[in-house]
Amino acid sequence: MARRGYRVTAVDLSAGLIDVCRKRLIEAGLDGQVRLVVADARDLGEVTEREFDAALLMGPLYHLIVEADRKTALKEAVDRLREGGLLFSAFLSRFGVLADLLRNNPGWIEDQAHVQSFVTKGKRPDDFPRGGFRAYSAHVSEIVPLHEAMGLETVFVSGVEPAISSDDAVYNRLEGRQRQLWLDLLYTISSDPSIMGASRHVLYVGRKK
């Protein structure tokens, strides 16, 4: 976005990642285009502007496992949009990650307490040991109501890896015309409700009323 001339405010909970971002911006000659802020998505008090054209939540809503925290983070972002501003938010899909689990950790299925908690609640059991990848996987049916309750008008919801979650590495190796034709097809079908939940990630786009 900065390369396209937009002024950007980038927020992350990790000071270390903000430092990495700062170094890359300097290397690219874009440090004057981007303001960097270390903050929790649930408290954007340091971001005082209320007239952003767009806000991108590319992680907080699937790392916050408590529903109230997700709602708080979403409200913080929406409150900083101008009227008509766009919000983009990413989710892990409840069932889209199963292909990865089957391929990389087939023994997961034997921990039935974990399996049932994931299927019904989208997260690990409450008594699961701390550490590792901590995430919430949303059911597709909850995404639109969550956003519209915050005063957003839904523009579209799409699966990010529609129909290819089990083998997107093959797509990533494609080049030229084949890659473009596959991209066009996947974009066309990405909002089909029958396959959206099979994507690893789901993208919501909404407009502030």
Language-model-detected regions and their locations in the chain:
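A short glycine-rich, Lys/Arg-flanked "PGG" loop and its adjoining helix->strand segment in the class I
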Residues: 71-86
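Short alpha-helix
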Residues: 132-157
